[in-house]
């Protein structure tokens, strides 16, 4: 695996990760995102429908929490989870937890970390964790770590220090077991940067993890509410400054478009794509614009639709402040609303996804109010393609030195 940077501007890194996979013939563009999956499958989608989406990332994200209870079957299968789930050609990254599902705290010890499957808690010692990775045979996997300390909540310095110490100990033990395993020689361990909101511990975690022979870094625990964003971004800038430039940086729990751009400016390369899934589960469609150089004629055609979405933002803010639905964002429209009952426009004018080319907002509204499964399929296809297109435009903006215009456009819609 080799990270090749073609451009670095104000902290933003543009390039490719080359020689990926067991055969070394895959490449991945950065900045980019991973394909979010549930138990190895894109939510709501079959492999056939997934192939109809443009710009699908080269690497899929699997979660250990969803696969841990099946490891005995995979151990007997012996050919890895990629072939087992019908994705033998895909690059696979195994993370500890599902970013959408919150994990109960208080179950990390000096010897184990707990993950939560459908059946309940699964305790992971280092040896059990590495045995499962041996059965899964992913291309990359997140090392075992104590991720209960984050920027979300104030935590004692003693607890934060313990989190960093445990994570480094887990990393050393995992690296030792990887060296002893012939199967895992082809897999890359991603070291985890912990430390909560304590600058000193974040920097210690970054420096110590960078001393180990890891293939990349996962910046964990940077998710939080908007009021702490500035503090989190200051931490992030300081941490990435300590990391080597020739290894990829992933971040967990950050997927909103405005936060993605802030993190890219601070040197983050790869993101999770759970945001489109969350939007789909709300019965919503992503409609935010990321075309920072729009065609004037198309702009006139889209003006009415854009004005409608701007009007919706005030309603969304009211919903957020009253607490009825704190998750809904200004990047999406709620197709369950009655006003879409006779709206025969596509979800987004000019969108090339299957849903927008073949169906209307009124049809999706009908599917949602009648609880048809097809609603989730069509919304997921659109939301994934829209989100993946956003990352394509980020890379194009970096190439042409237009990231400031893109960021202004996104933040105007987020405000």
Curated annotation (Swiss-Prot):
One of its GO terms (biological process) is tRNA-guanine transglycosylation. The lineage of its organism: Eukaryota, Metazoa, Chordata, Craniata, Vertebrata. It comes from the Eukaryota. Its cofactor is Zn(2+). It is a peripheral membrane protein. This is Queuine tRNA-ribosyltransferase accessory subunit 2. Changing residue 152 to E: Does not significantly affect ability to promote formation of hypermodified nucleoside queuosine tRNA. It is found in: Cytoplasm; Mitochondrion outer membrane. Heterodimer of a catalytic subunit QTRT1 and an accessory subunit QTRT2. It comes from Homo sapiens (Human). Keywords: Cytoplasm, Membrane, Metal-binding, Mitochondrion, Mitochondrion outer membrane, tRNA processing, Zinc. The keyword Transcription does not apply.
């Amino acid at each position: 695996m080799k990270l090749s940077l073609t451009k670095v501007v104000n902290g933003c890194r543009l390039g490719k990760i080359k020689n990926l996979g067991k055969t070394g013939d895959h490449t991945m563009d950065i900045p980019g995102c991973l394909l979010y999956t549930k138990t190895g499958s894109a939510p709501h989608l079959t492999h056939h429908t997934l192939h109809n989406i443009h710009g699908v990332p080269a690497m899929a994200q699997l979660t250990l929490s969803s696969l841990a209870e099946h490891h005995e079957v995979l151990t007997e299968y012996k050919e890895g989870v990629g072939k087992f789930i019908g994705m033998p050609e895909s690059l696979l990254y195994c993370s500890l937890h599902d970013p959408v599902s919150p994990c109960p705290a208080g179950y990390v010890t000096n010897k184990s970390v707990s993950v939560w499957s459908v059946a309940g808690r699964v305790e992971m010692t280092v040896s059990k964790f590495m045995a499962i990775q041996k059965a899964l045979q992913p291309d990359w996997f997140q090392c075992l770590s104590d991720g209960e300390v984050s920027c979300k909540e104030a935590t004692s310095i003693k607890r934060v220090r313990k989190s960093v110490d445990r994570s480094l100990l887990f990393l050393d033990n995992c690296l030792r077991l990887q060296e002893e395993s012939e199967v895992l020689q082809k897999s890359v361990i991603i070291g985890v940067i912990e430390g909560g909101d304590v600058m000193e511990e974040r920097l210690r975690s970054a420096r110590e993890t960078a001393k180990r022979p890891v293939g990349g870094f996962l910046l964990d625990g940077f998710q939080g509410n908007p009021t702490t964003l500035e503090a989190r971004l200051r931490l992030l800038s300081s941490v990435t400054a300590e990391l080597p430039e020739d290894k990829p940086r992933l971040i967990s729990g950050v997927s909103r478009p405005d936060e993605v751009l802030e993190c890219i400016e601070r040197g983050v390369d790869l993101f999770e794509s759970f945001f489109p899934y969350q939007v789909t589960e709300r019965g919503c469609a992503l409609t935010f614009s990321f075309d920072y150089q729009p065609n004037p004629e198309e702009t006139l055609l889209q003006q009415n639709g854009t004005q409608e979405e701007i009007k919706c933002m005030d309603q969304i803010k009211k919903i957020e402040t009253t607490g009825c639905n704190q998750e809904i964002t200004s990047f999406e429209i709620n197709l369950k609303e009655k006003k879409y009952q006779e709206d025969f426009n596509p979800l987004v004018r000019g969108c090339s996804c299957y849903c927008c080319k073949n169906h209307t907002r009124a049809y999706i509204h009908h599917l949602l109010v009648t609880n048809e499964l097809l609603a989730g399929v069509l919304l997921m296809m659109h939301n994934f393609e829209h989100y993946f297109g956003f990352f394509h435009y980020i890379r194009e903006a970096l190439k042409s030195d237009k990231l400031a215009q893109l960021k202004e456009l996104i933040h105007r819609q987020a405000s």
